[in-house]
Amino acid sequence: MTNELVYEGKAKRLFKTEEAGVLRVAYKDDATALNGVRKESFAGKGELNNQITSLIFSHLAEAGIESHFIRAISETEQLVKEVSIIPLEVVVRNVMAGSLAKRLGKEEGEPIPNAIVEFYFKEDALDDPFINDDHVLYLEIATTNEMDEIRQAARSINKVLQELFTQMNITLIDFKLEFGRDAAGNILLADEISPDTCRLWDKETNQKLDKDVFRRNIGNLTDVYTEVLNRLKQVQN
């Protein structure tokens, strides 16, 4: 196993492996907010996100949705296909919350009849600004056909995840996706899907089961992530 670091982000490190085109992802215990301005470490967070992401990506694969995920290899690590990340954060919104509620002057919790898909330019120095299709084309991030493919994939993923989280008695409020191109130019789902990247509310109590408990100081992060993992395991068995 090689320890040559390829990339380090806020929540993960990527390392080379002996196999060409395969990387090792190591999940960190760090949690960040305000685009990295606020940072804390929570013992066990990396393990929780690795397990949750591994289960969700496996579930998506069973539904016919391809991703970079290969398999988990330890409590905090997984193997993934190497992709070139497209610098877009793709946000799918099913319920008004967060920045969208503020931007549109709506109350949090208002259902969105047809999910809204948004693009954000993945650039920390600019605080990941909201952009439209014309910006994407101007920045040469993706072609029109690729944007259509990404949107369709995001909506397909949303459908599968909504059904999954409903079984867990959780409302999928919104979530962030990232995509990458493999060596052949195919677009694959990448990054992670976890309470770090999703807003999740308990269907009965509206308790927040995601990183908002850290952002807003309203609960224990590892407790709610553990709750999500336990519910996920129950419906997967």
UniProtKB/Swiss-Prot annotation:
Keywords: ATP-binding, Ligase, Nucleotide-binding, Purine biosynthesis. PROSITE patterns: SAICAR_SYNTHETASE_1, SAICAR_SYNTHETASE_2. It is an enzyme of class 6 (ligase). Pathway: Purine metabolism; IMP biosynthesis via de novo pathway; 5-amino-1-(5-phospho-D-ribosyl)imidazole-4-carboxamide from 5-amino-1-(5-phospho-D-ribosyl)imidazole-4-carboxylate: step 1/2. GO terms for biological process: 'de novo' IMP biosynthetic process; cobalamin biosynthetic process. Its EC number is 6.3.2.6. The keyword Transmembrane helix does not apply. GO terms for molecular function: ATP binding; phosphoribosylaminoimidazolesuccinocarboxamide synthase activity. Pfam families: SAICAR_synt. It catalyses: 5-amino-1-(5-phospho-D-ribosyl)imidazole-4-carboxylate + L-aspartate + ATP = (2S)-2-[5-amino-1-(5-phospho-beta-D-ribosyl)imidazole-4-carboxamido]succinate + ADP + phosphate + 2 H(+). InterPro entries: SAICAR_synt/ADE2_N, SAICAR_synt_PurC, SAICAR_synth, SAICAR_synthetase, SAICAR_synthetase_CS. The keyword Nucleotide-binding applies. Belongs to the SAICAR synthetase family. This is Phosphoribosylaminoimidazole-succinocarboxamide synthase. It comes from Listeria monocytogenes serotype 4a (strain HCC23).
